[in-house]
Amino acid sequence: MPRHKFATAITCIDGRVQQPVADWMKLHANCEYVDLITEPGPDKVLSSETTYVVDEIIRKVSFSVKYHESPVVALCGHHDCAANHSNREEHIEQINLGVQVLQSYTLNVRLLGLWLNEWGSVELVCDTEQREKLEVRL
């Protein structure tokens, strides 16, 4: 598998999230750099009707895909999110819905749904390359 220069991650602004997600992306998306697009509670935002915020996220993702040729985009939710007080199960549902919203924009990239758990470990929730929803232990 050829190594890509960039991948893209949509994460929370919470400083505990970026490094573990970037490290996971470098390993599992086979890239050198990760463009970070931050938004408070991005899983909740992308799974809701907040159109203007979604449009802004899509604008930034499109920039990363176009100019950095990012072939992989991940949406990540996390434990103890100040902007999204949902429980783990609700976060997982929002991540899956958010990935579906991203798919509707025809970005022509592999989309991943990620969950950063209470121990700071990244879990894969869904992967459009696998063409089916991964079952995550709830």
Report each predicted region and the residues it spans:
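Divalent-metal-activated hydrolytic enzyme cores
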Residues: 1-21, 32-33, 40-53, 63-72, ...
